[in-house]
């Protein structure tokens, strides 16, 4: 029987669970210290926790529910990990180096059902949600790697932009956020965390009401319904008429800036007229809007799309700026490895399938 990951419990939940099992509440703080400060990888290493408590934890929880299957390192310091879960499923996690610190991109689902026509993540459909513990454990595995190579570095930023739709796994995603933000543990600042959604409007309202101080990014990729439906099938169910009011509510409720993710596809959504249309869509909240322009990473299975030319990227950027919309072009990481989200996982599954025949 599979045991849940110990990393899925918030400090409050762990305190409550241990108390119900007859242990003193302070044991939870001790365990958390071992997990997140000393970062041990076995329960046996928790030397100031009594034997009965350790045996109970070991019987009830896993501290290593996933194993590293593949690791790719880029010349720029980016590392892409492929982890194998207890059920054999594969997920991706990426470590990126920035001037401001180390950022980890985590996965929230095994596969994805959103079906964006340019994305490698949706090549294999969703089979299940990840638990909160499995999401946290991705960060811990990256941190353990950093500890092992002796760099004395810590993960300082987190982006929830890996495989899957985070808002389709809402409760586990929120538990994950509460674990990594806790000052008793990883203590990753809320403003150093960004969650991305393809636009599940009802969950955007819910997320706004939580007022977590976490950054929100919307994967928009088109300034009108016709084009967005063409490249993102979710727009059929949640068109801009439903999405934009949710974005308005988020901005007004939180008074926080929102990031608009916009992947540039040559001849599809990268022309000046579309930049003007995008600027108009956000003109009433442009002071709280930032557009992240993303050069396309080609995916073999999506050969219909090509990367925009540098001239078209510059024109799009300049047009947004001239129309009062703050924007930037995303700095690329890991271009010499399987950089596109879901690409490494898809290749490994194909490789395993061929080997099994």
From Swiss-Prot:
Miscellaneous comment text of the record: Reaction proceeds by a ping-pong mechanism involving intermediate methylation of a conserved cysteine residue.
Annotated function: Specifically methylates position 2 of adenine 2503 in 23S rRNA and position 2 of adenine 37 in tRNAs.
GO cellular component annotations of the record: cytoplasm
UniProt cross-references to SUPFAM superfamilies, sorted A to Z: Radical SAM enzymes
Domain Radical SAM core residue range list: 98-336
Enzyme class, first EC level, given as a word: transferase
Species this chain originates from: Exiguobacterium sibiricum (strain DSM 17290 / CCUG 55495 / CIP 109462 / JCM 13490 / 255-15)
Location in or out of the cell: Cytoplasm
Enzyme Commission identifier(s): 2.1.1.192
Annotated catalysed reactions: adenosine(2503) in 23S rRNA + 2 reduced [2Fe-2S]-[ferredoxin] + 2 S-adenosyl-L-methionine = 2-methyladenosine(2503) in 23S rRNA + 5'-deoxyadenosine + L-methionine + 2 oxidized [2Fe-2S]-[ferredoxin] + S-adenosyl-L-homocysteine; adenosine(37) in tRNA + 2 reduced [2Fe-2S]-[ferredoxin] + 2 S-adenosyl-L-methionine = 2-methyladenosine(37) in tRNA + 5'-deoxyadenosine + L-methionine + 2 oxidized [2Fe-2S]-[ferredoxin] + S-adenosyl-L-homocysteine
Protein name: Probable dual-specificity RNA methyltransferase RlmN
Record GO biological process: rRNA base methylation; tRNA methylation
Note on cofactor: Binds 1 [4Fe-4S] cluster. The cluster is coordinated with 3 cysteines and an exchangeable S-adenosyl-L-methionine.
Active site: 92 (proton acceptor), 341 (s-methylcysteine intermediate)
Stated family: Belongs to the radical SAM superfamily. RlmN family.
Annotated S-S bridges: 105-341
Major location category of this protein: cytoplasm
Gene: rlmN
Keywords: 4Fe-4S, Cytoplasm, Disulfide bond, Iron, Iron-sulfur, Metal-binding, Methyltransferase, rRNA processing, S-adenosyl-L-methionine, Transferase, tRNA processing
Record's keyword annotation contains Cytoplasm: yes
A GO molecular function held by the record: rRNA binding
Residues annotated as binding S-adenosyl-L-methionine: 164-165, 196, 219-221, 297
Positions that bind [4Fe-4S] cluster: 112, 116, 119
């Amino acid at each position: 029987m599979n045991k849940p990951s110990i990393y899925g419990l918030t400090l409050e939940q762990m305190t409550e669970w241990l108390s119900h099992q007859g242990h003193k509440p302070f044991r939870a703080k001790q365990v958390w210290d071992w997990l997140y400060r000393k970062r041990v990888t076995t329960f046996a290493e928790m030397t100031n926790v009594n034997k009965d408590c350790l045996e109970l934890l070991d019987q009830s929880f896993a501290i290593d529910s996933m194993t590293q299957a593949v690791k790719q390192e880029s010349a720029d310091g980016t590392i892409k990990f492929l982890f194998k879960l207890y059920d054999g499923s594969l997920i991706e996690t990426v470590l990126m180096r920035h001037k401001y610190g180390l950022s980890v991109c985590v996965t929230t689902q095994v596969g994805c059902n959103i079906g964006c026509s340019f994305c490698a993540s949706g090549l294999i459909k969703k089979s299940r949600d990840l638990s909160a513990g499995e999401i946290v454990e991705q960060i811990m595995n990256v941190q353990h790697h950093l500890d092992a190579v002796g760099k004395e570095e810590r993960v300082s930023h987190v982006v929830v932009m890996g495989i899957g739709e985070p808002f389709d796994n809402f409760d586990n995603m929120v538990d994950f956020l509460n674990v990594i933000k806790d000052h008793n543990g990883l203590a990753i600042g809320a403003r150093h965390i960004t969650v991305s959604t393809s636009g599940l409007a009802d969950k955007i309202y819910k997320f706004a009401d939580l007022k977590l101080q976490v950054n929100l990014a919307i994967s928009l990729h088109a300034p009108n319904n016709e084009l967005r439906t063409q490249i993102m099938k979710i727009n059929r169910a949640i068109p801009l008429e439903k999405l934009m009011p949710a974005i308005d509510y988020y901005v007004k409720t939180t008074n926080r800036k929102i990031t608009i993710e916009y992947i540039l596809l040559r001849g599809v959504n990268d022309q000046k007229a579309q930049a003007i249309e995008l600027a108009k869509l956000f003109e009433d909240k442009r002071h709280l809007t930032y557009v992240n322009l993303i050069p396309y990473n080609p995916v073999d299975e999506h050969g219909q799309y090509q990367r925009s030319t540098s001239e078209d990227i510059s024109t799009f950027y300049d047009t947004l700026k001239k129309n009062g919309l703050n924007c930037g072009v995303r700095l690329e990481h890991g271009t010499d490895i399987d950089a596109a989200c879901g690409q490494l996982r898809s290749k490994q599954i194909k490789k395993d399938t061929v080997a099994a025949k």
